[in-house]
Amino acid sequence: MFEVDLRSDTVTRPSRAMLNAMISSPVGDDVWGDDPTVLKLEAMFAERFGTEKALFCVSGTQANQIALMSHLSPGDEVICHPYAHIYNYEGGGIAANAHSSVVFTGDDRGIMHPEGVLSCIKADDVHYPKSRVLAIENTSNKGGGTCYEWEEIEALRAVASKHGLTFHLDGARLYNALVAKNQSESDYGTAFDSISICLSKGLGAPVGSVLLGSEEFIHHSRRIRKRIGGGWRQAGLLAGAAIYALENNVDRLAEDHAAAKDMAEFLGQQSWVKNVVAPETNILIFGLNEDMDQEAFISTLAEKGIGISQM
């Protein structure tokens, strides 16, 4: 265990106050639909984003995959960024679960642009997969925590609407973007057909993500969640932690962003650092000089109780 663990924002541990919130949360059976704390969490998110319904899921991967299985049919295609988590880090789920293909567009910071999306949309021809879903990630993990400007999202929404694409947001770190850009939850709820939001990253809950969308979409998604083994029983204990995170930890994300900027400034002054990607939120990417061995560097830090990860 590292004294200072900077490998990921997923390594958070519940505070004493969060643990107390978990212990005091009333529970029922979520599969039966009567866990009061889960119902409260789902209602909170639906109200904040202005969507009809929400669904509490075990992870961001599960929430994304449920959404994609709900939106796609075999032979369909997803337009996403080559850095996208749904493509790179979800076990080939688009192919294995939704029996669909992907096509890529976007810049080197993880951001997609309308002209690139337009170039990916297939003609209605039996030789081609059917362009069905436009999926973006905000913030972009591999892009270094980059955020979309709201005008960029509106432009992508316009493309999706014009060409009949379902617009999905992998919002694993959406609250980082909301804090960094001072954006509105309700605007996102209006712009997207489905949104996944992780609660166990910077927000600090131990487990869980939520999936947002229309009543019809969430009804279908709940069936898919059950099919893939995602129905859980006394999930209110975990929902209690998520509620605490939502009520207490959102504003504190700005502290993480400030810490990342301070670290970037420090690293930029070191002779052994080749380059530092200016952080927008809580992810900091930097490169070492060619004469530095990355694995040895990481091992040396680990010996000193500091954990970082290699991209």
Language model feature labels by segment:
Residues L6, M112-G171:
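Active-site phosphate-binding strand-loop segment of PLP-dependent enzymes
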Residues S8, G33-D34, L55-V58, C80-H81, ...:
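General beta-strand structural signal in soluble alpha/beta enzymes
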Residues P14-G60, H81-Y83, Y87-N88, G93:
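Conserved N-terminal alpha-helix of the aminotransferase class I/II PLP-enzyme fold
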Residues L72-R132:
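PLP-dependent aminotransferase-like
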Residues A135-K142, S184-E185, G189-T281:
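Active-site C-terminal subdomain of aminotransferase-like
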Residues K261, G268-M311:
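Conserved C-terminal alpha-helix-loop-beta "cap" of PLP-dependent enzymes
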